[in-house]
């Protein structure tokens, strides 16, 4: 009977020891993940501040962040800051695909601050690609989500400028169509021998 009690106590001690070690490992892992994400968040905030001044440095800082154990938010912020830095360096192909990845996450989280950035960046991409209708659409969305992130005077200038260009393009297309129809009717008259 005593041997059975000693054996039960020994098993119970092993279970407690295993549970304590498990809790210790889990707490160290959680603390490590917290520190990694906190460090990444501060580096991302620093890099985000550098986008306007030195986009190459911002891009280099984002590239140095190890993304293995990042939270979903920090991972998406890495892509957003990277897209902003690339747009600052006037490279427009890669940021568009990065923004396609990031946009649904911030829409789901209803994060108007970052949605403003996304629409501003998309407007910049469309503006430099001469897609004026898309630029107007994205800058309009940017003004709707804007929480004093961007100067509304600049956005309104872009909007009015692009709306004017779109109107001018549509008006020119109408004149071109009329000129084409006039040329076709003149050609038909010249071909008609009567």
Language-model regions: role of each:
Residues 1-21, 28-194:
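A "functional boundary" signal
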């Amino acid at each position: 009977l005593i041997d059975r009690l000693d054996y039960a106590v020994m098993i119970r001690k092993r279970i407690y020891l295993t549970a304590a070690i498990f809790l210790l490992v889990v707490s160290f892992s959680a603390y490590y993940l917290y520190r990694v994400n906190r460090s990444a968040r501060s580096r991302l905030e620093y890099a985000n501040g550098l986008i306007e001044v030195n986009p190459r440095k911002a891009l280099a800082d984002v590239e140095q962040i190890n993304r293995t154990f990042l939270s979903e938010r920090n991972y998406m912020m890495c892509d957003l800051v990277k897209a902003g830095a690339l747009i600052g360096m006037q490279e427009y192909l890669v940021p568009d695909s990065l923004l396609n990845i990031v946009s649904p996450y911030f829409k789901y989280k209803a994060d108007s601050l970052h949605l403003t950035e996304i629409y501003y960046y998309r407007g910049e991409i469309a503006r430099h690609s001469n897609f004026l209708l898309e630029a107007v659409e994205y800058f309009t969305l940017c003004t709707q989500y804007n929480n004093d992130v961007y100067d509304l005077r600049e956005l309104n200038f872009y909007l009015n400028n692009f709306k004017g260009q779109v109107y001018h393009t549509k008006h020119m297309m109408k004149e071109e169509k009329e000129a084409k129809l006039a040329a076709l009717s003149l050609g038909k008259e010249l071909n008609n021998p009567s």
